[in-house]
Amino acid sequence: MAELVHLQNTSTAEDIIEVLNNDAGVIIDGLIDQKEVNLLNKDLAPYLKNDVFGRDEFTGFKTKRIGALIARSEACRNLALQPLVNEVSEKYLSPFCDGYQLHFTSAVSIGPGESKQILHRDRGIWGGYLPRRIEPLMSTIWAVTEFTKENGATQIVPGSHLWEKDRIPKENEIAFAEMKPGSVLLYTGTVLHGGGANSSKNDIRTGVFLHYALNWLRQEENQYLSCPPDIAKDIPQEVRSLIGYSKGGYILGFYSDPKDKNAVYESVSPENMFKDEVMDRFSTIPNPEELVQKSTK
């Protein structure tokens, strides 16, 4: 059976990326402590107690899923900023962008009797239109409970990011992301993976999914609806920027305030939405020649 590499929580971003380049998946053991895990459980429990089960085999008839974690959970906001994960995301994705964004948030609880999910690549969310050479995602699954093969630990196929798209993995090529609470699985958007079957009698497997994507791609979870301005104004600026209330490149993501009759907030960065003073406009191009040169890779 294939196995995933486990690294210590003292590992560097370079250590992690070296494994990702080979396997496209790696587990960092104990990256957050039990206190942080308890805070996640406390924040998520009121939502996961509801019957929010999947609607098909892919989402799982015995699997609960909730989103909008940035708006709903302070613990998840802190988790989204975890320094080592963000350093890895920035360095791994930097060949394809000038910044990254939070793409998707979800808490997933796989209940007893759930079947295994079909193996898939998360980059498929964009319909297969992205060139294969572009890696669009750095995804994470944080263990809130223990992940075991019996209770539905994520299936992942190490090295499958390098395969031809039609190759089907053999059973002995599939690894299981078995890990303790507070550990995290990092994996790319191109690796084959899927939720595992939960064959236990009463063991529920819960994880927090936080995925980071290139800042020029549309997010899977619409963060501006999941965390609208009236909620975003009360969360830390660093988190707001990560979910998209910021500019990308020179002008991506600008807005004009339709209620502003004096045209003060005209073609400005979303960051201005939460400031009393206009700090940034897109009306001046400091170096047009450089902008033109960078427009084609």
Regions found by a protein language model. Give the residues of each.
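Catalytic core of non-heme Fe(II) oxygenases with the double-stranded beta-helix
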Residues: G113-M179, T206, L217-C227
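Non-heme Fe(II)-dependent double-stranded beta-helix
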Residues: A2-N22, D29-L119, R123-Y129
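Short Ser/Thr-interspersed hydrophobic loop/turn segments at strand-loop and sheet-helix junctions
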Residues: V108, E146-F147, T190-V191
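A structural signal for short, well-ordered beta-strand segments
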Residues: F104-A107, T140-W142, V208-Y212
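A structural signal for short, well-ordered beta-strand segments and their strand-loop junctions
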Residues: I27, Q101-H103, Q155-I156, L186-Y187
